[in-house]
């Protein structure tokens, strides 16, 4: 029976998403104007925010750009906000968009160096606990200066490479042969060529390393203003530079970093939560043989490329630390330097670098449309007012927990943007002092970054890992990710709360003021970024 036009419409709408999801989005689009015009703009605004959070939470059913974008377009069309307000939000956060476009693409051209480093870690270090700590620390360090998505992308590339090499050799082929590593490894007679126990141990080993690395990106990403996109938004609103941001965050981020490393050690040592899987000796030998094979094939031209990438890496860290240019422009310089000196001049080769970041950049622009609705309809006014009625450290803890809970189910860039905008409005209205605003900015930043490791919804790097081609190969499901992240979620969240509740954050911030490591800011300075647009 031929498909009717209505069936064709539903079939095309949002592609391969489940039918119930398509109906839900269409229902949202019908309900929102009715609520806005006939019930209350405030209620309609909150419903829109919840619908948008729903699209983020269901990211595995459908990438949020399309459903979230439809909701945002309708919101502008019916008057919940204006196109000019959306543009204003995008203008105010232009640096974040440049970070995503240029920095992620720039690091793409440094992948060879990062692959080289992580490969050496696995092949040269035999202790599972030590290699886990190295992966966690290396990811944390890299994520403090690079985009977490890129760091995870590199580690995924390493893991896929190792998995395919093992699969190839275990299937009776040599390193240079073509092979489908996604196959079940059976021969022509249907017999299994692969040792099942060996393969399962190897999968477990890769799962462990990827989860440690994923949490490492959160541990490092929270420390600096370029570690995560929302950090840059918060830094811009507070008018902080790279060094000041790191210093202000340190009373929370340094204890959390040590707690995270200790957690990594403990779960590996006692083999809790699915950790402690060992790399079988036979697999280790295959990987070492392959690394030696690759080293022998590496020409002077290849070695020179690694040297260039290392020099560009030094420039990247120095440029960010000394704030020699805006983050996006430093990213652009990384693209130019690596491609120019490594001979990548083909337009198509350049284009591949931008594929990873642009969908998320477009999604971020949709975030800002929803933020514009929140501002115009004053949705968070009552919530913020309630939180601001509390005093001192309790107020900071409320903001930390509120950000943390929302970041577990929604994207932390969205959550961080909403809260810092609301707190800044409270500062401009004279409800809080500038020093309290700075402390709240720390609570918001750490709140969005740390508890969000709980689920793949909160951390873009985790979602990227879950939706990668590697996840099914190593049997990494949504539920398994949540379970393996649980010890980190509990420890990082509690240590973060304790650092704030105990007064340690406030005391250390005062110490930094007294020692002139940081200076007091004025309300006027906070207005500067907004006034510039």
Curated annotation (Swiss-Prot):
GO terms for cellular component: plasma membrane. One of its GO terms (molecular function) is sodium:proton antiporter activity. It catalyses: 2 Na(+)(in) + 3 H(+)(out) = 2 Na(+)(out) + 3 H(+)(in). PANTHER family: NA(+)_H(+) ANTIPORTER NHAB, TRANSPORTER ARSB-RELATED. This is Na(+)/H(+) antiporter NhaB. It is found in: Cell inner membrane. The lineage of its organism: Bacteria, Pseudomonadati, Pseudomonadota, Gammaproteobacteria, Alteromonadales. Na(+)/H(+) antiporter that extrudes sodium in exchange for external protons. Keywords: Antiport, Cell inner membrane, Cell membrane, Ion transport, Membrane, Sodium, Sodium transport, Transmembrane, Transmembrane helix, Transport. It is a multi-pass membrane protein. The chain crosses the membrane at residues 10-30, 67-87, 98-118, 131-165, 209-229, 247-267, 310-330, 355-375, 396-416, 454-474, 481-501. Belongs to the NhaB Na(+)/H(+) (TC 2.A.34) antiporter family.
């Amino acid at each position: 029976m031929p498909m009717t036009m209505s069936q064709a419409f539903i079939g095309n709408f949002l592609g391969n998403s489940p039918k119930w999801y398509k109906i839900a989005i269409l229902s949202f689009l019908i309900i929102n104007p009715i609520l806005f015009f006939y019930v209350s703009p405030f209620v309609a605004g909150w419903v829109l925010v919840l619908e948008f959070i729903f699209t983020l939470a269901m990211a595995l059913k459908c990438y949020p750009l399309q459903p979230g974008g439809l909701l945002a377009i309708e919101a502008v069309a019916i008057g919940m906000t204006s196109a000019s307000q959306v543009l204003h939000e995008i203008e105010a956060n232009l640096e974040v968009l440049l970070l995503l476009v240029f920095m992620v693409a720039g690091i793409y051209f440094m992948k060879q160096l990062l692959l080289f480093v992580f490969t050496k870690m696995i092949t040269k270090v035999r202790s599972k606990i030590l290699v886990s700590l190295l992966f966690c620390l290396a990811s944390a360090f890299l994520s403090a200066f690079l985009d977490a998505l890129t760091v995870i992308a590199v580690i995924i590339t390493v893991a896929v490479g190792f998995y395919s090499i093992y699969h190839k050799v275990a299937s009776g082929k040599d390193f240079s042969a073509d092979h489908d590593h996604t196959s079940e490894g059976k021969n022509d007679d249907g017999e299994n060529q692969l040792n099942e126990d060996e393969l399962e141990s190897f999968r477990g080993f890769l799962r462990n390393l990827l989860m440690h690395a994923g949490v490492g990106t959160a541990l490092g990403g929270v420390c600096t203003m370029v570690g995560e996109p929302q950090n840059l938004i918060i830094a811009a609103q507070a008018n902080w530079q790279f060094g000041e941001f790191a210093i202000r965050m340190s009373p929370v981020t340094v204890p959390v970093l040590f707690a995270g490393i200790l957690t990594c050690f403990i779960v590996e040592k006692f083999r809790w939560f699915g950790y402690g899987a060992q790399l079988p000796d036979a697999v280790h030998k295959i990987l070492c043989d392959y690394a030696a094979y690759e080293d022998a094939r590496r020409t002077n031209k290849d070695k020179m490329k690694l040297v260039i990438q290392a020099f560009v890496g030094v420039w990247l860290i120095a440029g960010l630390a000394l704030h020699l240019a805006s983050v996006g422009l430093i990213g652009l310089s990384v693209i130019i330097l690596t491609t120019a000196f490594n001979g990548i001049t083909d337009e198509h080769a350049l284009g591949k670098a931008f594929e990873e970041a642009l969908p998320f950049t477009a999604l971020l622009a949709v975030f800002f449309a929803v933020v514009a609705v929140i501002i115009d309809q004053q949705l968070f006014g009552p919530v913020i007012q309630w939180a601001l009625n509390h005093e001192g450290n309790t107020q900071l803890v409320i903001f930390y927990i509120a950000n943390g809970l929302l970041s577990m189910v929604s994207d932390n860039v969205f959550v961080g943007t909403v809260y810092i905008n609301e707190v800044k409005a409270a500062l401009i209205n004279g409800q809080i002092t500038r020093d309290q605003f700075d402390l709240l900015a720390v609570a918001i930043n750490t709140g969005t970054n740390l508890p969000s490791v709980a689920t793949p919804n909160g951390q873009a790097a985790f979602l990227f890992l879950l939706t990668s081609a590697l996840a099914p190969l190593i049997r990494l499901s949504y539920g398994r990710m949540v379970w393996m992240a649980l010890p980190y979620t509990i420890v990082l969240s509690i240590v973060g709360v304790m650092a704030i509740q105990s007064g340690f954050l406030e005391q250390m911030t005062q110490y930094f003021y007294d020692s002139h490591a940081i200076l007091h800011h004025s309300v006027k300075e906070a207005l500067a970024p907004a006034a510039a647009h």
